[in-house]
């Protein structure tokens, strides 16, 4: 009888130790994931501030804005530049011509 109870207790202790070890590993992986995610967000310029300066509404596509980088901001055909910007035609390669809106001061 004592032997049966001892084996049950031993199995229960082993199970609890494995469960605790697994839980600890999961927490460590989550911490590593959070650190990696935070590092990636920082390197991409994301400040992790709650939607400051952003609108919940859909963006207004009635005019073409100024590009933030060299490859972003190509205006679709027929769309005019937003106020304070002027349309500049640029050439890429031999046959590709596209329009970009830049500040009127340039």
UniProtKB/Swiss-Prot annotation:
Keywords: Amidation, Cleavage on pair of basic residues, Neuropeptide, Secreted, Signal. GO terms for biological process: neuropeptide signaling pathway. Expression is seen in the peripheral and central nervous systems in tissues such as the brain, the inferior buccal ganglion, the gastric ganglion, the olfactory lobe, the peduncle lobe and the optic lobe. Expression in the brain is distributed in the median inferior frontal lobe, the superior buccal lobe, the prebranchial lobe and the pedal lobe. Not expressed in the vasomotor lobe or the palliovisceral lobe that controls the cardiac system. It is found in: Secreted. Residues 1-20 form the signal peptide. The modification Glutamine amide is found at residue 52. One of its GO terms (cellular component) is extracellular region. Residues 21-41, 55-106 form a propeptide. Its main location: secreted. The keyword Secreted applies. Evokes contractions in the radula protractor muscle, and may regulate feeding behavior and gut motility by controlling muscle contraction of the buccal mass. Belongs to the SCP family. This is Small cardioactive peptide-related peptide. It comes from Octopus vulgaris (Common octopus). The gene is SCPRP.
């Amino acid at each position: 009888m004592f032997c049966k109870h001892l084996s049950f207790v031993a199995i229960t202790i082993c199970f609890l130790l494995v469960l605790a070890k697994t839980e600890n590993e999961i927490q460590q992986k989550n911490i590593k994931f959070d650190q990696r995610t935070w590092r990636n967000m920082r390197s991409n310029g994301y400040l992790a501030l709650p939607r400051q300066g952003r609108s919940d509404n859909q963006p207004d596509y009635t005019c073409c804005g100024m590009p933030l980088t060299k490859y972003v901001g190509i205006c679709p055909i027929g769309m005019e530049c937003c106020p304070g910007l002027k349309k500049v035609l640029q050439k890429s390669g031999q046959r590709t011509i596209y329009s970009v809106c830049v500040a009127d001061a340039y």
